[in-house]
């Protein structure tokens, strides 16, 4: 299983002072050096953490894989096509939320989704949809032309005991179903050093996307050490 590191919260910390440090690009390079297989950033409509210039510099610097998380808007479509990350991930977005709170509503957007994704496919940019671990959502993602589904693990992260085991089973079943219909499978949201280990047993999940847990651990142990620790946990 591979690790993709989300560096949004490095930008959040920088923006708290309105200055230049810590630099999310430097964080991305350290994460790659420590074993990350990809870098994730979310260019939100309100630009609350990652800025347009960050995205340009990340594109120039990242040598593994750049995954641009984005809302389904014409503005961000144009930016993504101009930037050419290896991968874009469509996520839901609400201005009032602190972080992404759930999966992309594929049922609501399905009628326009295929046309929206076509330019990315033509440009050779892989497309991922951040969705709930739900069979209908996975089927619609495949029909819309997605290459990858990122299964939302937020509920798993919030639960404990038997309820968490049930959610893990739901995620595992969803991953198997997605793989069987030809989709690549990744997972993310709320994963941390305490709850990640069971995902090593879900062989269909190729990659996990983790940000907040790594950045908070890095405050105490350093970023390179925090990334190396997570890489070791998922191998």
From Swiss-Prot:
Site (Transition state stabilizer): 150
Binding positions for 3-amino-2-oxopropyl phosphate per the UniProt entry: 6, 17, 190, 211-212
Source organism: Chlorobium chlorochromatii (strain CaD3)
GO biological process: pyridoxine biosynthetic process
The protein's name in its UniProt record: Pyridoxine 5'-phosphate synthase
InterPro entries: Aldolase_TIM, PyrdxlP_synth_PdxJ, Pyridoxine-5'_phos_synth
Keyword Secreted applies: no
Active site: 42, 69, 189
Class in the EC hierarchy, top level: transferase
Domain of life (superkingdom): Bacteria
Functional description taken from the UniProt entry: Catalyzes the complicated ring closure reaction between the two acyclic compounds 1-deoxy-D-xylulose-5-phosphate (DXP) and 3-amino-2-oxopropyl phosphate (1-amino-acetone-3-phosphate or AAP) to form pyridoxine 5'-phosphate (PNP) and inorganic phosphate.
